[in-house]
């Protein structure tokens, strides 16, 4: 007997138990899913197929479980297993470097706007993609092509306007697709192609008006389809015919027109009673509200007018918008198309696309339209044709491509076009024709290559064209060398060239007709052999005209070029294009055709942008210089192809934003200079800070230009939390092809109508020709939003809230022909508001509030034919007489405009009323005058003067003693509100005040907050309670977080990583530590190690700290890394000069008389005195700068005068004291004085004058006992009295100028003696204390001050005269005694020796055997007689930039060089003048250089 089976003795296997347990649950879930699916939301509610348990979607893993490690998880996301959750993170772009193993990706609840082609590359295992609740309006082609495993895709609750064709073609496994709650209007026939497994498709809550009849073709597995709440009026016949498994269909809430075209739907719904309930008619009126399924066929009627009309989305509707289709011809001429249409009627045989803006023919552009016989693409902007763009067109007979920008014909582009008879390629930029280009064109009879850049043609190019009858080759720069000999022979035998093709070069052949030349004329010299490979498009070019070529370097610097030359030699390694007028780098493949190019310089041009893929193929470029241009943004396709780029310089452009991924592919980049760019540090730039920290590149640092809170802060140092977007600062990079939100862009027409816009959108495309902004809420026309629209011809701003047209608002819109501003609140038209509109033909200002028109307002409107001014309350006095005369000249006003005032002119037509009736009989009312000038409303108070400003703004110029927008406040002790915490300040008497505290505060200044930690608190885990304003917060112990410190912190996670400057965070469970990079230290590696503590700078050089390094900033005349280079005086003067042992302390020795023994000292900035021994003027440039002096003597009086200059609103000028004190500071641009001799309360006063304007001001301070007097710029003196028992201010502490040390500053601030802790920033030119000029060199202590005001004065000079190169000049005469041997006559190699007793002042020392006065006689020398050459030493004027290290002068300098010869002596400067030159460095540092300018040259023996 067999042993019993092991399975009969054991309980059922676990897998079987599990199935028995969950089977009832699954059946229940299936029942619920079937009924709830169309309206369910999340991935968890997908339909369960009828294929049984195997398709339920529950997976019990039986092997290893994949996990995405932390290193492969995007920093802003969280990863669990193979799931990546990036939801609700405020993202503006899809995170980079998502693991290729991810199966579920959640991106819902972010701020994504565009899905780019590269966003989901390599994610071949992705099964679920969640993109709901974003702002997505565009999906690029092929964005989902790598998602071959995708099962569920949610795109609902976005702003999609259209769905790309074939966008899920690669996703054959897709089960569920949700695109509901968007703004989609049409669904084309190829949208869902390839999604044969799709079971659930949700398209509800869109704006769909058109469904292609084949839209759902092939979706044989579809079970659920929702189309409810759209704008469908009809449906193509039998559109649901192939959906045999459909079990849920929603069509409700659509405005169906129940005519004869919809009768099929009624029959369909009656046969499938469970589908599409509540589908009702909207029209005609007798059927409105009726259920479609309840109607009989005879009730669906069509009127005679519509019986034969095509259905709204019928088969005929495949005609592409906005083209016209008839009889097999698709006419798309002049429709502003930018690409070839993707849909055409099936019977199309002729396609007309001329005069559009098409730029390329992509692969297989016409492969679906095999019936095409004629294609016209003339007069477009086509520069690129894919090699298979014309594949499949076997019936094509005519191809017209003239008037484009084609530069290259790819190999095989005409392959298979055996029926082609006419090929027009004239008026392009074709430079070469491959030998096999026309190989398949056996039927071609006419070929035009007229007007291109072809230099040669390879033998055999025309061999395959057996039917050719006419060829046009003229207007090409043919090089008639031996390589073109065959063409002359060919044209002799086949006289088919009828355009008169001629030679361009060589010179002997210039302008000679090719067909008339004999074969022996076609010769090749060595350099002309470069055309030998023309048939392979590998010929090389000569050096471009206007450029200089040396070796492999092509230098086109400073040639005034407006575009890059096309004939750059192929062997070029360095291309220099600096200092030209290039405006934009085109994506025309130029750099990709230079295989050896390593260095490209484009500095100091007018570049505003670089087209995407402009550098594609330029894989060997290592250095790219783009500094000092006008580039405004960096796109993510700008530098594609630069795989070996190491150095990228974008210094001094106008870059405000960088698109994510812009530098991602620059793997070799080591140096990136982004200094001097106005980066907008909002939420769109947060990724860039992280990228910069990670890369640690060399070069100028990128700094924020906005918002003001973070201005000048290095981007990489800014924490992620500081990158914020607000309503005023939310704009990111717009990029090419951008269309503003709430607008639709079709070609060059932009429509932004009826969108409740408050202002004109930013980023309107520059090529816009028509702009519609009507029916919004725009109140003001921002000039900067429209000034770039130079192609605009029509602008509609009607039905808005505009109140004023300011001067020169439309000055740049020179092509504008129609301007509509009707039905606004326009009350003021300024004199030059319409200046520049020379081509304006129609102007509508109808329905506004205009009363007056300035004379000459319409003088630029030379082309005007119609003006509408009706329904305006025009005031018809003598001020409008000019308008009456003007409209009667050409009758451009149709007789609608009427007068509203004055009474005698009321309701009279301006056109028909005689001009003599327009007279002035009294003063115009203020309410009318105030429409353009708000000052007539008298807004200013206290006798202030009102000054009118643009946009009907105004400014009140206050009388002394008042301030505020309307001068409504007095300048008294309460100026600037000295009370804290929103307390109310009340003046007690002159100079004294009291504070009434808000609830929760106490103290003299309401500075003390009531301690809320004394009551019951909820802080946990030994947290410390921190008092707030009627609240408290818990300060947690290390390792805890949360409002009440009840959460354990996960150290070193993306949410908590305080380590800065590239430091590595290490988690120790209870705490963390940071492993700092070199050059940093501190708990979070935030402190830069001061490398200047042990610096080696010599000769007074200033140490400048860096990152793990320092630099020495040398004084004048010293050079070297450590300023170790010697002073130049010893070389500038002979050893006998008095300057050799001068006594100048802080200056340069100067001899006014070269022959004398006296000298003067020219002092360095800030120093005075005979020997420059006194430091009397200093600059303060740091927040903690100050000077410490001895205590101020106050008996019998204290008198302090400070001459200073500052552009900062706040800063400490002087301070001395403790409780009793004298404090003087800048506060809100005025001088604030706090004076207390010990009599409480303190006395305070403010200057009436504003002094923070960058100009020099003198403030005089006089303290006599209790009295204190202030006078500014010798104006009116004002006084206060600190009344009380004490008479004198007793001071024993040091006096500080320009700032305070930390401890005294905190104490003074705490005691309300000063209003801010900021040091003075500016220059103190002179300081007098008790009638003595202060020598700061004797100060007890100095901290971070700079001698003199040179920097400030340099900036002032720059503002006053930007064109002036030099700041001053000082004659310098080099001491050079006359050399008697300078023009000696010694011969035959003899030596000249000075001798004062000789007749000529010198003596000739002859060689052996020579004699004579000049050694010109005798024997003994085998040397031939020599003659001293006449001196050719001369001064040569030049004008160029002066450069030094990485710096240069601001302007080209006019100076001279000594050139020529002096025999055996040197040609050098005899007289020089020293001038100060402003220098600017690449890192934005500025300084002043003392430069010796040559004034006279001569010969000298001293060659140095």
UniProtKB/Swiss-Prot annotation:
> Which residue numbers delimit the LRRCT domain?
254-304, 476-526, 677-727, 872-922
The phenotype of cells or organisms lacking this gene is: Flies lacking sli exhibit disruption of the developing midline cells and the commissural axon pathways.
- State the PROSITE patterns in the record: ASX_HYDROXYL (PS00010), CTCK_1 (PS01185), CTCK_2 (PS01225), EGF_1 (PS00022), EGF_2 (PS01186), EGF_3 (PS50026), EGF_CA (PS01187), LAM_G_DOMAIN (PS50025)
Subcellular compartments: Secreted
- Keywords, alphabetical: Developmental protein, Differentiation, Disulfide bond, EGF-like domain, Glycoprotein, Leucine-rich repeat, Neurogenesis, Repeat, Secreted, Signal
GO function term, MF aspect, one: heparin binding
Q: Which organism is it from?
A: Drosophila melanogaster (Fruit fly)
Q: Which residues belong to any copy of the LRRNT domain? A: 64-100, 310-346, 534-570, 730-766
Taking every annotated instance into account, which residue ranges of this chain make up the domain EGF-like?
931-968, 970-1007, 1009-1046, 1048-1086, 1088-1124, 1135-1173, 1377-1416
What name goes with this protein?
Protein slit
């Amino acid at each position: 007997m067999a042993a019993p089976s092991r399975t009969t003795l054991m309980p059922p296997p676990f897998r079987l138990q599990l199935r028995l347990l969950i089977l009832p649950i699954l059946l229940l879930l299936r029942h619920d899913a079937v009924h709830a699916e169309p309206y369910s939301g999340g991935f968890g509610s997908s339909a369960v197929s009828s294929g049984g348990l195997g398709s339920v979607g529950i997976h019990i893993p039986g092997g290893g479980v994949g996990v995405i490690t932390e290193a492969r998880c995007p920093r802003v996301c969280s990863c669990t297993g193979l799931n990546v959750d990036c939801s609700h993170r405020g993202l503006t772009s899809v995170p980079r470097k998502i693991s290729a193993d991810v199966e579920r990706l959640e991106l819902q609840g972010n701020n994504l706007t565009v899905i780019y082609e590269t966003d989901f590359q390599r994610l071949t295992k992705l099964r679920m993609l969640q993109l709901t609740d974003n702002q997505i309006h565009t999906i690029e082609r092929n964005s989902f092509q790598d998602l071959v495993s995708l099962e569920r895709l949610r795109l609902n609750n976005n702003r999609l306007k259209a769905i790309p064709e074939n966008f899920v073609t690669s996703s054959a496994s897709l089960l569920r697709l949700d695109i509901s709650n968007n703004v989609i209007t049409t669904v084309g026939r190829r949208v869902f192609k390839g999604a044969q497994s799709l079971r659930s498709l949700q398209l509800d809550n869109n704006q769909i008006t058109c469904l292609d009849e084949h839209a759902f073709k092939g979706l044989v597995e579809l079970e659920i389809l929702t189309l409810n709440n759209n704008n469908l009026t009809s449906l193509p016949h039998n559109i649901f015919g192939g959906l045999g498994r459909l079990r849920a269909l929603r069509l409700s809430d659509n405005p169906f027109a129940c005519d004869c075209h919809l009768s099929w739907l009624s029959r369909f719904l009656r046969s499938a009673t469970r589908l599409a309930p509540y589908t009702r008619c909207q029209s005609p009126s007798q059927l409105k509200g009726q259920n479609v399924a309840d109607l009989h066929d005879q009730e669906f009627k069509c009127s005679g007018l519509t019986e034969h009309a095509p259905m709204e989305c019928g088969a005929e509707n495949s005609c592409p918008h906005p083209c016209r289709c008839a009889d097999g011809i698709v006419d798309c001429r002049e429709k502003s198309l930018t690409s070839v249409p993707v849909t055409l009627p099936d019977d199309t045989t002729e396609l007309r696309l001329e005069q559009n803006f098409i730029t390329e023919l992509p692969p297989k552009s016409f492969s679906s339209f095999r019936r095409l016989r004629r294609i016209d693409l003339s007069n477009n902007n086509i520069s690129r044709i894919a090699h298979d763009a014309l594949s499949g067109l076997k019936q094509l007979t005519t191809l017209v491509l003239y008037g484009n920008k084609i530069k290259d014909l790819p190999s095989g582009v005409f392959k298979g076009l055996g029926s082609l008879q006419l090929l027009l390629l004239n008026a392009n930029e074709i430079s070469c024709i491959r030998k096999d280009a026309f190989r398949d064109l056996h039927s071609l009879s006419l070929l035009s290559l007229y007007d291109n850049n072809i230099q040669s043609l390879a033998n055999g190019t025309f061999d395959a064209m057996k039917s050719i009858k006419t060829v046009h080759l003229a207007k090409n720069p043919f090089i008639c060398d031996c390589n073109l000999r065959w063409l002359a022979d060919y044209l002799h035998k086949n006289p088919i060239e009828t355009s008169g093709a001629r030679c361009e070069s060589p010179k002997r052949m210039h302008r000679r007709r090719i067909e008339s030349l004999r074969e022996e004329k076609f010769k090749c010299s060595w350099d002309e052999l470069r055309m030998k490979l023309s048939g392979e498009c590998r010929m090389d070019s000569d050096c471009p005209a206007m450029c200089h070529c040396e070796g492999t370097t092509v230098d086109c610097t400073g040639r005034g070029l407006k575009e890059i030359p096309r004939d750059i030699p192929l062997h070029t390694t360095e291309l220099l294009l600096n200092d030209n007028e290039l405006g934009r780098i085109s994506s025309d493949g130029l750099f990709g055709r230079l295989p050896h190019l390593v260095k490209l310089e484009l500095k100091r041009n007018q570049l505003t942008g670089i087209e995407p893929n402009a550098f594609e193929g330029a894989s060997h470029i290592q250095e790219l210089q783009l500094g000092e241009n006008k580039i405004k943004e960096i796109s993510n396709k700008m530098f594609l192809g630069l795989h070996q780029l190491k150095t990228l310089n974008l210094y001094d452009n106008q870059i405000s934003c960088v698109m994510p991924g812009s530098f991602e592919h620059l793997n070799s980049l080591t140096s990136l200079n982004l200094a001097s760019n106005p980066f907008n540090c909002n939420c769109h730039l947060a990724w860039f800070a992280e990228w910069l920290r990670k890369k640690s590149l060399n070069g100028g640092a990128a700094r924020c230009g906005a918002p003001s809170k973070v201005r000048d802060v290095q981007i990489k140092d800014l924490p992620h939390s500081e990158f914020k977007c607000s309503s005023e600062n939310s704009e990111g990079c717009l990029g090419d092809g951008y269309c503003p939100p709430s607008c639709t862009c079709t070609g060059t027409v932009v429509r932004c109508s009826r969108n409740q816009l408050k202002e004109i959108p930013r980023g309107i495309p520059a090529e816009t020709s028509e702009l519609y902004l009507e029916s919004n809420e725009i109140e003001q026309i921002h000039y900067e939003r429209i000034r770039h629209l130079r192609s605009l011809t029509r602008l509609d701003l009607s039905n808005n809230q505009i109140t004023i047209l300011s001067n020169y608002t439309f000055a740049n819109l020179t092509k504008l022909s129609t301007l509509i501003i009707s039905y606004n609140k326009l009350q003021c038209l300024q004199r030059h508001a319409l200046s520049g509109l020379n081509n304006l033909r129609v102007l509508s200002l109808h329905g506004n509030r205009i009363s007056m028109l300035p004379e000459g307002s319409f003088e630029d409107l030379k082309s005007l034919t119609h003006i509408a001014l009706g329904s305006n309350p025009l005031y018809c006095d003598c001020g409008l007489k000019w308008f009456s005369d003007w409209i009667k000249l050409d009758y451009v006003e149709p007789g609608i405009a009427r007068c509203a005032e004055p009474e005698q002119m009321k309701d009279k037509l301006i056109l028909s009323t005689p001009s003599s009736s327009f007279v002035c009989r009294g003063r115009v009312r203020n309410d009318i005058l105030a429409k353009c000038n708000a000052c007539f409303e008298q807004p200013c108070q206290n006798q202030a003067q009102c000054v009118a400003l643009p946009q009907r703004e105004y400014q009140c110029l206050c009388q002394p003693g008042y301030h505020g927008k309307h001068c409504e406040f007095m300048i008294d002790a309460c100026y600037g509100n000295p009370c804290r915490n929103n307390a109310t300040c009340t003046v007690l008497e002159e100079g004294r005040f009291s504070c009434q505290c808000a609830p929760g505060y106490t103290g003299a200044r309401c500075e003390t907050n009531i301690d809320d930690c004394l009551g019951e608190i909820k802080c946990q885990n030994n947290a410390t309670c921190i008092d707030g304003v009627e609240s408290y917060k818990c300060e947690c112990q290390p390792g805890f977080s949360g409002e009440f410190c009840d959460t354990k912190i996960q150290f070193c996670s993306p949410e908590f990583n305080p380590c800065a400057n590239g430091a590595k965070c290490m988690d120790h469970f209870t705490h963390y530590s940071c492993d700092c990079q070199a050059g940093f230290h501190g708990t979070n590696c935030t402190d830069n190690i001061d490398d200047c503590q042990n610096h080696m700078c010599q000769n007074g050089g200033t140490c400048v700290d860096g990152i793990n390094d320092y630099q020495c900033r040398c004084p004048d005349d010293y050079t070297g890394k450590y300023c170790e280079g010697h002073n130049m005086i010893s070389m500038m003067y002979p050893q006998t000069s008095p300057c050799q042992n001068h006594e100048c302390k802080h200056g340069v020795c100067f001899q006014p008389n070269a022959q004398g023994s006296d000298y003067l000292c020219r002092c360095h900035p800030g120093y005075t005195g005979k020997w420059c021994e006194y430091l009397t003027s200093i600059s303060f440039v740091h927040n903690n700068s100050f000077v410490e002096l001895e205590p101020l003597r106050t008996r019998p009086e204290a008198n302090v005068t400070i001459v200073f200059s500052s552009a900062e609103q706040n800063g400490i000028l002087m301070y001395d004291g403790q409780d009793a004190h004298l404090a003087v500071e800048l506060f809100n641009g005025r001088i604030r004085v706090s004076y207390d001799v010990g009599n409480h309360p303190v006395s305070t006063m403010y200057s009436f004058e504003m002094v923070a304007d960058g100009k020099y001001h003198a403030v005089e301070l006089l303290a006599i006992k209790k009295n204190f007097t202030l006078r500014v710029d010798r104006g009116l003196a004002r006084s206060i009295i600190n009344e009380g028992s004490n008479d004198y201010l007793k001071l024993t502490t040091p006096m500080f100028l320009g700032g305070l040390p930390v401890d005294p500053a905190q104490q003074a601030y705490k005691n309300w003696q000063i209003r801010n802790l900021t040091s003075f920033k500016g220059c103190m030119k002179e300081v007098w204390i008790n009638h003595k000029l202060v020598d700061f060199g004797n100060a007890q202590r100095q901290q971070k001050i700079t001698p003199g005001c040179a920097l400030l004065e340099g900036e002032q000079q720059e503002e006053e005269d930007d064109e002036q190169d030099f700041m001053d000049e000082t004659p310098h005469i080099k001491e050079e005694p006359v050399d008697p041997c300078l023009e000696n006559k010694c011969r035959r190699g003899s030596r000249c020796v000075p001798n004062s007793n000789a007749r000529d002042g010198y003596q000739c020392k002859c060689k052996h055997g020579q004699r004579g006065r000049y050694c010109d006689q005798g024997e003994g020398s085998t040397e031939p007689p020599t003659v001293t050459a006449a001196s050719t030493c001369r001064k040569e004027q030049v004008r160029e930039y002066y450069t030094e290290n990485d710096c240069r002068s601001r302007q080209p300098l006019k100076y001279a060089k000594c050139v020529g010869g002096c025999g055996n002596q040197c040609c050098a400067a005899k007289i020089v003048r020293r001038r100060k030159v402003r220098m600017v460095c690449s890192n934005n540092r500025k300084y002043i250089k003392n430069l010796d300018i040559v004034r006279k040259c001569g010969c000298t023996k001293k060659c140095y």
